[in-house]
Structure formats: C-alpha cells, structure tokens
C-alpha cells in the first residue's frame, strides 16, 4: 500500500463522514462536499478516524490519491481554504459590486467576474483579492481564472499575481 494511504485521516469535531457504495460525502460547518468513490477502495470509519485500504493491487496508487482528496475535503468543511491575489500596476483595482468582482486591469472596460457557487470573493484593499471556499480545487481554479485575466509580465511585473509569488524579471532590450 502507498505511504500516503497508510496514514489514517482524523475527523475533527463537527465533521461527519458518510461512505456509500459509490459516493463519499463530508459534512461540516462550512458546507458539504462529495466525491465519487473509486472501485476497489475501501474506507473504514472507527470513531473519529478513517482508514483507507485497497482490495485490489491495481488500486493501491489511487488509494493514496483518494486519501489526500478526503483529507482536503475534511479540512475544507471544517476550516476552509483561501487564496490571496495581488494587483500590481498603475490603475489596477478590484472592487466588489454585490457578489460580483469588478476588475480594472488596463483594458478599455472593467471586467466583471461572477463568483461560482460555493466560492466567496472579497477585496480587503483595492489591490488585493481574497478567494475563499470549502473545495480546495475550486478555490484554486477561481484564483487561476482571475489571475489569467492579466498574468504578471516579466519586464515591469504588472498584472495579477498570487500573494508571495516571485515574478522572475527580464532586462529590457538595450538599443
């Protein structure tokens, strides 16, 4: 069995794990997440600990993947995930219009981004965007989509970047 799958997953208080023949659902204070259970992966719940095992040697690799996804689901419904974006550039601003995000990124028109269900967008300052949600994958997808509107360019570093992201700069062409 894979090293990841051998490690049991602990269930914090307030989190409920429900395993059905083809579906795994995790319910907690931040919402409910579901996952299609792969064939050949067994989940045993013992109190506040869940252990995974593969009943087929060909399913050993997927067992570790399911364990990692399950751990992220449990963390998501109990604590949640967030991704912070920064806007770098003159006139680059973000503002909330109700539940929609309005971005001024140097185009002739402002971009309006509608937050998908289960994702919360907020702007602590005009140059920061906070993407929050219970599903780690969807939080990352939404953050990547917003970053994709104006990715950072290597000459001046202008654009939308993740907080803490290092942009490798290039030197301008000499005449």
From Swiss-Prot:
Its GO CC terms? cytosolic large ribosomal subunit
InterPro entries per UniProt:
Ribosomal_uL6-like, Ribosomal_uL6-like_a/b-dom_sf, Ribosomal_uL6_a/b-dom, Ribosomal_uL6_bac-type, Ribosomal_uL6_CS
Extract the signal peptide range: none
Q: Which UniProt keywords apply?
A: Ribonucleoprotein, Ribosomal protein, RNA-binding, rRNA-binding
* Swiss-Prot/TrEMBL GO biological process terms: cytoplasmic translation
One Pfam entry for this protein is Ribosomal_L6
One GO MF term on file is:
structural constituent of ribosome
Q: Which family does it belong to?
A: Belongs to the universal ribosomal protein uL6 family.
Family annotation (HAMAP family): Ribosomal_uL6_B
Assembly description: Part of the 50S ribosomal subunit.
Q: Which PANTHER family match?
A: 60S/50S RIBOSOMAL PROTEIN L6/L9, LARGE RIBOSOMAL SUBUNIT PROTEIN UL6M
Please describe what this protein does: This protein binds to the 23S rRNA, and is important in its secondary structure. It is located near the subunit interface in the base of the L7/L12 stalk, and near the tRNA binding site of the peptidyltransferase center.
Query: What name does UniProt use for this protein?
Result: Large ribosomal subunit protein uL6
